[in-house]
């Protein structure tokens, strides 16, 4: 056996680790992960916002939310989130979850109906981290 400490992890290794974990999880919960994203582009085709995640375990796991600075506050983020939530509900999801940092958008997610279900705070030099959940009529 050889154990290595890596300072960088390439995409292939990261994906292999994720695949092995999902295979293990699948042996306990017979459900697979389905990618889901909603994106917005401007008239020139430039990406101006997006929400990306996956549906699994009857939940929408939101992994990335980004809106270009000049489009923040325009309602674009809310529209992208709503589109993903609608599709997640069609897929049988009962809730959505995400995590965010204190300098990112916890207030935005609260406006979307998410509630803080856990947090990590008080670590010097580190932003607070919030774990948030939104239940869909269940």
Region annotations inferred by a language model:
Residues 97-99, 115-133:
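Conserved catalytic-core motifs of GNAT/GCN5-like acyltransferases
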Residues 46-54, 59-66:
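Conserved beta-strand in the GNAT
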Residues 88-101:
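Conserved GNAT acetyl-CoA-binding A-motif
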Residues 10-20:
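A short, well-structured alpha-helix characteristic of acyl/acetyltransferase catalytic modules
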Residues 17, 109, 114:
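Conserved active-site tyrosine of GNAT-family acetyltransferases
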Residues 1-9, 138:
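Conserved N-terminal entry element of GNAT/NAT acetyltransferase domains
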Residues 35-51, 79:
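Conserved beta-hairpin
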Residues 73-86, 111:
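Conserved acetyl-CoA-binding loop-helix of GNAT-fold acetyltransferases
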């Amino acid at each position: 056996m050889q154990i290595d400490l890596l300072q960088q992890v390439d995409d292939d290794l990261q994906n292999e680790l994720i695949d092995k974990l999902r295979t293990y999880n699948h042996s306990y919960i017979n459900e697979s992960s389905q990618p889901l994203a909603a994106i917005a582009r401007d008239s020139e085709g430039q990406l101006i916002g997006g929400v990306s995640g996956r549906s699994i375990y009857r939940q929408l796991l939101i992994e990335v939310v980004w809106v270009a600075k000049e489009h923040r506050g325009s309602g674009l983020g809310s529209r992208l989130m709503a589109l993903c939530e609608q599709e997640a509900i069609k897929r049988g999801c009962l809730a959505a979850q995400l995590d965010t940092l204190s300098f990112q958008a916890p207030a935005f997610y609260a406006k979307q109906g998410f509630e803080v279900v856990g947090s990590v705070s008080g670590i010097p030099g580190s932003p607070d981290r919030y774990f948030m959940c939104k239940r869909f009529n269940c």
